[in-house]
From Swiss-Prot:
Role according to the record: With S4 and S12 plays an important role in translational accuracy. Located at the back of the 30S subunit body where it stabilizes the conformation of the head with respect to the body.
One GO BP: translation
Classification of source organism: Bacteria, Bacillati, Actinomycetota, Rubrobacteria, Rubrobacterales
Protein name, UniProt field: Small ribosomal subunit protein uS5
PROSITE patterns cross-referenced by the UniProt entry: S5_DSRBD
NCBIfam families: rpsE_bact
GN (gene name): rpsE
Compositionally biased region (Basic and acidic residues): 29-49
């Protein structure tokens, strides 16, 4: 009898992080849910999931010649109102993803919600990109694409309308979405700031 063979998922590094397509796009391999999110660590009883939005290959010209590095844009969230975005850079794809995950976890913040949607309309901005986020009725779903969808879904938002304005660079759109979510306030918070009753 021969020795049993063990297999390793292609693109997976020794740390368990998976490699992506160096030309960009979504993440690849390892156990994921139906929408491509990957189970991760637990934070206060909630499971943190992550999604690799983009992997880019960057060439630096030095005295010894060209040196290749990779950058990975990663979104993490618990699906219950907390989300974070991180950009990791390293000389290998798995290392870049791991750094992106770590930065995203440290950058997690709370997202105010009203049932399954956001409490009010908001426009997030980052450099030349803007993302309009509008509340939607239950059952609408997340009307968004690419990185914008990843941020909203991992935050736990199930019904929302979005529109991308300006630059459609993945990094800019993700950061603009993050900015929009950071601007959200609950009804109680708005009333406290304004000192008057409001209707949302």
């Amino acid at each position: 009898m021969g020795r049993p063979r063990t297999s390793q998922t292609r693109g997976q590094g020794p740390s368990g992080a998976t490699g992506g397509n160096p030309r960009g796009g979504g993440s690849t391999t390892r156990e994921r849910d139906a929408r491509g999110a990957r189970p991760g660590e637990r934070d206060g009883g909630s499971e943190i999931q992550d999604r690799v939005v983009q992997i880019r290959r960057v060439a630096k010209v030095k005295k010894g010649g060209r040196r290749l590095n990779f950058s990975a844009l990663v979104v993490v969230g618990d699906g219950q109102g907390r989300v974070g975005v991180g950009l990791g850079k390293a000389n290998t794809v798995p290392a870049a993803i791991a750094k992106g995950q770590e930065k995203a976890r440290h950058a997690m913040f709370d997202v105010p919600m009203r049932n399954t949607t956001i409490p009010h309309e908001v426009v997030g901005e980052y450099e030349s990109s803007r993302v309009l986020l509008k509340p939607a009725s239950e059952g609408t779903g997340v009307i968004a694409g690419g990185g914008v969808r990843a941020v909203l879904e991992l935050a736990g938002i199930k019904d929302v309308l979005t529109k991308a304005l300006g630059s459609t660079t993945p990094v800019n759109l993700v950061r603009a979405t993050e900015d929009g979510l950071r601007q959200l306030r609950t009804k109680a918070q708005i009333e406290q700031i304004r000192g008057v009753k409001v209707r949302l």
